Amino acid sequence: MPLVVPHAAMPEGRLMTAASRRSASPLPTLATWALWLLGALLLVFVVAVPMDVTQQLVFSGVLFAVALAVRNRGGRVVILMMMGMSLAVSCRYIWWRMTQTMGVGSAVDFILGLGLLGAELYAFVILVLGYFQVLWPLNRKPVPLPADQRLWPSVDVFIPTYNEPLSVVRTTVLAASVIDWPAGKITIHLLDDGRRDEFRAFCAEVGINYVTRTNNAHAKAGNINAALKKCSGDYVAIFDCDHIPTRSFLQVAMGWFLHDTKLALVQMPHYFFSPDPFERNLDTHGKVPNEGELFYGLLQDGNDQWNATFFCGSCAVIKRTALEEVGGVAVETVTEDAHTALKLQRRGYRTAYLAVPQAAGLATESLSGHVAQRIRWARGMAQIARIDNPLLGRGLKLSQRLCYLNAMLHFFYGVPRIIYLTAPLAYLFFGAHVIQASALMILAYALPHILQANLTNLRVQSRFRHLLWNEVYETTLAWYIFRPTLVALLNPKLGKFNVTPKGGLVARSYFDAQIAKPYLFLLLLNVVGMVAGVLRLIYVGGSGEQQTIWFNLAWTLYNMVLLGATIATASETRQVRSAHRVPLDVPVTLYLPDGDVLPSRSVNFSTGGMAIMLAQPQPIEPGLPVQIGLSHRGVEQTLPAVVRQDRDGQVSIQFTQMSMEQERWLVASTFARADIWLSQWGQHDRDAFWRSMGQVLEASARGFGRLGGHIVDSARQGFRPRRAVDLES
């Protein structure tokens, strides 16, 4: 079937290889370097020039006013301008912190102050690397395939599984079996490390290959490497067993391989149609970009500019010869995907990212499962830093090394985040001055640094990460990732690959006190700190000291807001729907037993049922057996169902027993539609400061309310903490 590519492809005359597109520049190289040098010298001058409080406030105020004035203008130049102003203000702050605020004080002041300065330097480096990473996102578009299908390469599709239930794997396999690709050039393989007879029988019924091995060495990476030896396709497409591909996946992905012989990897987004724990427990699904959207919506496009696209383990196609050249999927770390991309790039291969969602999967169901997944990612990036550090060795350009450095450093935010959550308590409890400066001077330097950086990120990240939500995500995960990352740095061989649980249910709402325990402790410390601060305010005289008290009280209050949102995330809401509903608006036909034919449109669907809106509402009795007509490639097929509910013309139906071909048809006409996820990808409104602030405050208030309810329940029934999934320490 011919493919209509979701994004307009470039005309043939304008096709450029990935390499030439990355290096394209309107300025000669010498002139570019001259401009960079001039900018660096100007920045050094701006950073180092001494200013008093008034001059500093005027300088930073002017830059902030300019940024406010231009922030809504279009064009990349505006973003580069805002980044430059943000760096100027932030560099002034860091320079001031290092040269003016680490003066003589007590040993305790100096040690605690050094810890805070270290956390701030870490945040500054991440800010600079983040700006570099998204300096000029490539925004690559799909390239059409040749009209002659004989020129299309052969592809092996791998779906690795271990302990996931067949109900999760089933839809992915059926979707893979209807991918639009010449029949003689595609082979589907289910790689079952669970060695289950039920899966073997299912594969035989569907007509795909069932592949297993005698051991589970190296987990998912070993599973894929073992399967590589049993097949011979030119390329390998890999899907996690819950990632359902669309029919057009390969036609969107493969064009670039035929236009660039050095291209080894095409990665596409991981889109999740079910809410993750943050979205479900904070009721932000569809309202706030989830934790992963920044990476797949912006950072990977930025990486692509520098030929530093990461392989993400699923929704990707890899060139077989390139993969075999680097020894298969990397097995030395628990983030085998990112490490494999690094090995390919070291060998001079190019990698590409297409921000076109052509597969969708299930998000983690519980906060504890989500945390366990992030622990593995954090440990794996720390292992890469030790075992195959991108800053060292041959084969990478400086730009690639910087992208990997940002990715590795990102997962070390645990310690800095905990420092931020406790730093004001040093003064409120003990009177320690961690910053040797007046509150006014701190505000004059720190506030512009924070405001300018947030305003810039508001412009750059707006559709993919709303303001302050990064604080909530990092606060929630900080306690759990700082130890694995530090341990992996010391001994990268410790730890194991843990499979992320998918397809589970939350039978009843409950408060996961086990996962929230560190944050309950931190919240208690901050509450006591607030009390101590108020007492200091009452009993300590002197306007200078009062300013310092107010500054630390405000900081502590902000920390309490973040901790409240974190605690709300640990309050698991009930999730009893095993098959998640997906919005879909397409024509369908409802056939009644008496012969009536009712034209309708779908509202949403799942593997178990569908909601439809009748064109002409009429009462339909619940329990009535019906047939639902769904079209695929212009042909309609009916599927058996029963009416469950009729609400003013919106009818809910439940599918009944279907044949394998009917089930395959259902998947092909719903989950596997080429455009099914496009309307839901990157469609969030641009962020607004007050809206984000209100959402975070609402989440925090919900957390305090749920904590209060949990305390009351515990007092009545006795405290019995629950944990949904054991965490790997």
From Swiss-Prot:
Gene3D superfamilies, A to Z: predicted glycosyltransferase like domains, Spore Coat Polysaccharide Biosynthesis Protein SpsA, Chain A
Top-rank taxon, per record: Bacteria
Catalysed reactions listed for this entry: [(1->4)-beta-D-glucosyl](n) + UDP-alpha-D-glucose = [(1->4)-beta-D-glucosyl](n+1) + UDP + H(+)
Description of activity control: Activated by bis-(3'-5') cyclic diguanylic acid (c-di-GMP).
Region: Catalytic subdomain A, residue numbers: 151-244
Cofactor(s) demanded: Mg(2+)
Entry EC number(s): 2.4.1.12
Membrane topology: Multi-pass membrane protein
Subcellular location(s) per record: Cell inner membrane
Binding site for substrate: D240, D242
GO BP field: cellulose biosynthetic process; UDP-alpha-D-glucose metabolic process
SS bond partners: none
Domain PilZ: 575-671
GO cellular component entries: plasma membrane
Active site positions: D193, D337
Record GO terms (molecular function): cellulose synthase (UDP-forming) activity; cyclic-di-GMP binding
Domain statement: There are two conserved domains in the globular part of the protein: the N-terminal domain (domain A) contains the conserved DXD motif and is possibly involved in catalysis and substrate binding. The C-terminal domain (domain B) contains the QXXRW motif and is present only in processive glycosyl transferases. It could be involved in the processivity function of the enzyme, possibly required for holding the growing glycan chain in the active site.
Family: Belongs to the glycosyltransferase 2 family.
Function recorded in the entry: Catalytic subunit of cellulose synthase. It polymerizes uridine 5'-diphosphate glucose to cellulose, which is produced as an extracellular component for mechanical and chemical protection.
Name of the protein: Cellulose synthase catalytic subunit [UDP-forming]
Biological source species: Xanthomonas axonopodis pv. citri (strain 306)
